[in-house]
Design a protein with these regions (language model features):
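Generic intrinsically disordered, low-complexity segments enriched for polar/acidic and small residues
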Residues: 1, 45-46, 63-66
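Amphipathic alpha-helical coiled-coil segments
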Residues: 53-79
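Structured alpha-helical bundle/scaffold domains in large eukaryotic membrane-trafficking regulators
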Residues: 35, 42, 75-82
Length: 83
């Protein structure tokens, strides 16, 4: 999944929408991982995962930025009449 994030944005709406769907799925996995880590934390035993949770939040935010770039590109292409 990471490979296409480093390439230039596609110029076809269908490709952009496919990428948005993939990125949203990865965001969902991040959210599930965050919830899982938070559920496993135990204050009494001193079990915490702050670094892992922070990293996942950062990843989720980065993915949101990629989604926004793709949505802007889709909107621009639609304004120009592309498919």
């Amino acid at each position: 999944m990471e490979s296409f994030l480093q390439n230039p944005l596609p110029t076809r709406i269908s490709e952009l929408e496919e990428q948005i769907a993939l990125i949203e799925a990865e965001q969902k996995r991040c959210t599930e991982s965050i919830r899982g880590l938070m559920a496993r934390e135990d204050m009494e035993k001193g079990i915490f995962f702050p670094a892992e949770i922070h990293e996942l939040h950062q990843r989720k935010n980065m993915l949101e930025t990629h989604i926004q770039y793709r949505r802007v590109r889709v909107n621009r292409l639609r304004m120009r009449g592309a498919r």
